[in-house]
Amino acid sequence: MDYLKWRGDLTFSQDAFNEVDNLLLSFVAYVNLEGLSVGAGEERVALEELSRRFFVLHSEEELAADKSFTRLAPYIVKMMAQSNRYRTSLISNYVNMVNPQLELQFSAVQLDLMDGSKNFCFRGTDDNIVAWKEDFNLGLGEVPAQKLASEYLNRFGVGTSPIRVSGHSKGGNLAVYAAAACKIEVQERITDVYSNDGPGFVHEFVTSDSYKKIQNRIHRYIPDSSIIGMLLENPVEPQVIKSTAKGILQHDAMSWQIEGPHFVSASLSESAISLHETLRNWLENIDENARTQFVDDLFSILESTGVDTLTQVQEGGLKNAAAMLRELHQIVPGTWSELENLLKAVLPFSGFLIMGRQKTVDRQNIPRAVTSHRAIHTSNKNHNENKVKQEEKRK
């Protein structure tokens, strides 16, 4: 990463914590730290030593098998561990909980930087379908991971040090939620909250007193064609970042452009604005049961492929598209428009699904008389063709 190559030699006493540092800490949260003795109540380990342990425990072949967009996180941490800026940072209190039955995925880690701060980083969404469903369930009220995030911050945020809270994707949502819901003695020491393309919240939360107490400490960053970061309500004005990727692939923060210690600014695309407005207007006019049904419908389509990740859905191409089309036919027509908008944003081959669904609808809407006429016409055509073939054989 260019930032570490050009500025990694600068300690925090030489150059203060900035927005790019926040994003780097979010990458640390994506690394699997199981078995490295940095769990809750275990050691505090310097990042340099942590990285060494990680690459002893995990082979290059194992890491190469990871096809998710977070696959580069261990290598980013390795670069951080080799820099003056981060190598002596202390890592601790790593937790990781996954329960598909409860649609729960929660992970967090603490980093103590040499500027005297405690930094709590929440893992976001990789491209696992279960994790993405939890993202969308955020629109239905509190999810288990949010409650765990506030409990985590209360447990490990004790002391006198200044606190930063951050995360990418769902991790950004958890960072904001935890900062708003934590104990007042912890909340008073929070200097900054960072949400990197994190989804928003239900209306009741963003209008609550607890949210308003930390609202002016929230920094929100989204790429120029953001999808996840535009979900639900988020009163904080975002800084829009130029990305080298397209569509949902912009959610990969490795595509975000950086210049010095800052992100490169851009304007929000029309597609991002349109999708946000469409979903917002629709969600405002339906009840909680309809919202739940919408989320279930969307993910029943994705899960019909039989794979675990969005990467695998895309790699399956038309085979997976066919499975999804069959599932789409089972969906109540009232949600088709909104489902199609999301599928178009997420999957490159979704046009096939929408065309296939529309052709089916068109066939279903053909009047019986027209269908009968077509059947008679086809029968007569086949009869005439057979008659010609018989004449040719006689000759």
Language model segments and positions:
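Gly/Ala-rich beta-loop-alpha elbow adjacent to hydrolase catalytic centers
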Residues: G167-G171, A175
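Short glycine-enriched nucleophile-adjacent loop
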Residues: A175-I184
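Alpha/beta hydrolase fold serine-hydrolase catalytic domain that processes acyl esters and thioesters
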Residues: M1-K118, F122-G139, V143-P162, K183-K381, ...
